[in-house]
């Protein structure tokens, strides 16, 4: 594609002297080759402007800058991140305009809600692309996932592939980092869903206000906003919304959709979805009140995109729990072992509360906190565990460059250190062995924090760690053949 075509919808200072043919738009100077367009972006640890000359030397046809560098083949823009996303979209012939786009954002529940919406659309005959934390799923094909929301080159490559393979919709998790970094700039969504917001990612955003401001961006460019009215900050999302607003709630009758006659069972939830006199019975195979909210978010979104309520209900009834979200490990033990991605204070609290009713014995929780991430949530995680668990084992999560012992020390600040049922074991495998060794019949063991992840980030290494297989190995069971698709 010619430079003049790429810049058709991107304002810039300068003139196109050489209307070169471009086949790659990148912000990574190491990938530059002839016929590339290099975009200079200020990252936290590196300013792409310092690599502009290297990019030109490697054959880049031109560079896009935010700062004036005085280079011959320089196109200066007001916001290079925004330009990057729009240029990648143009290079792929705007596949986002050929799909029905649904974005889901919030601290907790994004993966479950996007998966459920994808299931409902697929069951209704709409081939759908799913992008998110666990995997990218094109129709029935699972593709590897790196970031929760892909960077522009990967995102538009996925969208383009989806269009070419007959997809009519895309459901994506919209992370706060992606929204803050402008990865979704230029996309007009058909629907945006807000699940909830609690403290997370403050290591990146700095303040909670910056965090919620990033989330709001999704609703400024959506024709339809689906908002969880149970969240204390829901009105801020509503105020930021530019399109039609639809609300849902498990408790408030003023919402457009409410949940009535809620039954929280040991392994599922039942409730009636009520709106304007219409009642639809909903079942979803995941416990806890948050599962009601997740199912409501998916159903309300689908219904307002034209899906019949009964069809949405039928799809939810046959949907299974998402990988690493309240996932039960099949291990033939006299106690239950559950794996969940809960890695925030609120997330851990919600999962522990969901498991309590079905726990006939002690509720045992094993967890840690990520290194090089928000340190202020660590004692809050410890406090949540102390409030809801009978036995606590504090261990490592992804310590990254931090000392695991220091991270554990931060967690312990929020606990009652006099508790005789609180244990510390920095080695996660040994901690899992301790949890299983001390579990008794009827107990529930929650392995929190890793969820779908099958690795640990320690130092500069990515080391294999599949908690399912770790449990099975400790118990002397054979290797699992694999988890069934949702």
What are these regions (language model features)?
Residues 9, 65-71, 165, 180, ...:
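Acidic, Mg2+-coordinating active-site environments of NTP-dependent enzymes
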Residues 1-86, 90, 232, 258-263, ...:
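N-terminal leader/targeting and accessory segments in enzymes
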Residues 7, 84-229, 233-244, 296, ...:
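Phosphate-binding loop of NTP-binding sites
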Residues 67-69, 133-134, 176, 197, ...:
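Short, ordered loop/turn segments at secondary-structure junctions
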